[in-house]
């Protein structure tokens, strides 16, 4: 059989989200079988969902041909059902697939990507906005409740050097907020030269390679707290935390400032989710199959 995206509520009820125009006759294939749609995210009320769907454009019985616009982003609600997000302004013939993977709490702003190369946004189901072409953004996942803050990791698309993180507001534009710093927060380990922080300053490294790469996974509802990580599998990862009016710090530094000395010695390098209130964070260590819950109801950040 062919599966499809569904919503499961806390009382156990399951609602099928359906498919787009193919009557569940075909879908994307995997070792678990075929699926006509995959869900990625829901808004805060569970009334809207977004994800990936499959459409048989050329009616050959196959719904996953690349570069034909058969693998598409969808949005769903109970009243209108599943429908494609607008990709009419994108070069679909050059894109193997497009998906939607995040939605703001109020359902107004949807984020997605194609082939992990481009960052897209849809505002109130309008045309796709290519944030990579506009700002040099990598695929984005973190968005505030009202959709007016989207965390973007920026790169120079000509040199591929990091440019730090910025908050994008579809109504007001871009606000840079910096990043963690080489040597102070993030080691720079060269494949051939070892730890360059032993012979260079963080500013000297930044001048050559740009800012440390940042991945922002989530933010609080008001967008005042961001969680993510910096680094790579070559240099190792460090957990990252940004608090409005305070700035960036590593999680090791944060735990140390709270007096949680034992936690500061254990890498919290993969914080992946934060509650809407910003008081609870879930994450763990990159590559390890366990998670921690960090309760931040009482936080003191001082030097």
Kindly give the residue locations of the regions a language model identified.
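Conserved "turn/edge" positions that cap or connect secondary-structure elements
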Residues: 1-303
């Amino acid at each position: 059989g062919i599966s499809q995206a569904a919503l499961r509520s806390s009382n156990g009820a399951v609602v099928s989200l359906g498919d787009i125009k193919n009557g569940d006759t075909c879908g994307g294939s995997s070792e678990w079988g075929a699926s006509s749609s995959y869900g990625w995210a829901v808004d805060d009320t569970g009334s809207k969902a977004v994800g990936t769907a499959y459409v048989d454009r050329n009616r050959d019985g196959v719904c996953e041909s690349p570069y034909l616009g058969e693998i598409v982003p969808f949005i769903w609600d109970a009243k209108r059902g599943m429908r494609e997000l607008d990709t009419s302004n994108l070069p679909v013939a050059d894109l193997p697939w497009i998906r939607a993977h995040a939605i703001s709490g109020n359902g107004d702003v949807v984020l997605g990507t194609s082939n992990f190369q481009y960052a897209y946004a849809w505002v109130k189901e309008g045309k796709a906005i290519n944030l990579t072409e506009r700002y040099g953004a990598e695929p984005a996942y973190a968005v505030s409740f009202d959709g007016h803050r989207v965390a973007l990791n920026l790169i120079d698309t000509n040199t591929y050097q990091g440019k730090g993180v910025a908050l994008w507001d579809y109504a007001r534009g871009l606000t840079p907020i910096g990043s963690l710093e080489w040597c102070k927060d993030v080691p720079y380990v060269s494949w051939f030269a070892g730890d360059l922080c032993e012979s260079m300053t963080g500013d000297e490294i930044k001048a050559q390679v740009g800012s440390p790469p940042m991945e922002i996974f989530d933010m609080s509802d008001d967008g005042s707290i961001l969680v993510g990580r910096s680094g790579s599998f070559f240099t190792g990862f460090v957990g990252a935390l940004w608090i409005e009016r305070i700035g960036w710090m590593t999680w090791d530094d944060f735990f140390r400032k709270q007096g949680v000395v034992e936690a500061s010695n254990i890498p919290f390098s993969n914080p992946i989710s934060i509650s809407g209130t910003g008081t609870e964070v879930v994450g763990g260590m990159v590559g390890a199959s366990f998670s921690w819950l960090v309760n931040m109801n009482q936080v003191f950040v001082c030097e």
